[in-house]
C-alpha cells in the first residue's frame, strides 16, 4: 500500500469516518473529527505503523488541519 493510502487509512480508523478519504481537505479539528486525545492516538499510530516519529514541537494544529496537510507534513518527516 502506498504511503498516502496508509496515512488515510490511519485517519479513517481514528476518525471513524471515510469522509477523510473522500475529502482530503476537510478541516479535521473544525469538524470535530480530531480532538486532543485523537491527535495523540494519531501520532502513536503514525509512529507504530509508518515508523515516523513526530516531535511534539513539530506538531502545529494549523499545519495538521486536513488529511492533505498531514500527508505533506509526514512526507517531510520521512
From Swiss-Prot:
Key words, A-Z: Cell wall biogenesis/degradation, Cytoplasm, Phosphopantetheine, Phosphoprotein
Keyword Cell wall biogenesis/degradation listed? The answer is yes
Presence of the UniProt keyword RNA-binding in the record:
no
Q: Name one GO biological process term.
A: cell wall organization
Its pathway, per UniProt, is: Cell wall biogenesis; lipoteichoic acid biosynthesis
Q: Where does this polypeptide localize? A: Cytoplasm
Task: Describe the location of the Carrier domain by residue ranges.
Answer: 1-78
Give GO terms: molecular function aspect only: D-alanyl carrier activity
Q: How is it modified after translation?
A: 4'-phosphopantetheine is transferred from CoA to a specific serine of apo-DCP.
State one Pfam family annotation. Answer: PP-binding
Q: Which residues form a coiled coil?
A: none
The record's section on InterPro entries has: ACP-like_sf, DltC, PP-bd_ACP
Q: Which Gene Ontology cellular component terms are annotated?
A: cytoplasm
**Primary location recorded for the protein, binned into one broad class:** cytoplasm
O-(pantetheine 4'-phosphoryl)serine, modified sites: 36
List the Gene3D superfamilies hit by this protein, alphabetically.
Answer: ACP-like (1.10.1200.10)
Q: Which family does it belong to?
A: Belongs to the DltC family.
Q: Which NCBIfam families match?
A: dltC, PRK05087.1
The record's function comment reads:
Carrier protein involved in the D-alanylation of lipoteichoic acid (LTA). The loading of thioester-linked D-alanine onto DltC is catalyzed by D-alanine--D-alanyl carrier protein ligase DltA. The DltC-carried D-alanyl group is further transferred to cell membrane phosphatidylglycerol (PG) by forming an ester bond, probably catalyzed by DltD. D-alanylation of LTA plays an important role in modulating the properties of the cell wall in Gram-positive bacteria, influencing the net charge of the cell wall.
List the protein's name: D-alanyl carrier protein
Name of the encoding gene: dltC
